[in-house]
Amino acid sequence: MARIGGEIEQLGQLKATFDRESRTVEELTRVIRSQLQTTAWEGPAAERFRSMWSGEFEVSLRRLQEALVEAGAEVARRQTALVQAGS
């Protein structure tokens, strides 16, 4: 038989971790984007890299950030359900 339950406080801490790290990834993306825009770098390699950044790397970071937000929201939903079940 499956066990159901969880430590409410720990779930809250887990959600906070997902939220915090989501903001970290968002800030990391912003910092790299800004520095890439202001870095003196020209030529075909620079163009290829900037294209890869905007087409692949930044997209991957945005997806990671969104996944962390969604994971935090899911933990919050489960935490709420456990609180309601215990009431």
Regions found by a protein language model. Name each.
Residues 1-87:
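N-terminal secretion-targeting helices of virulence/extracellular proteins
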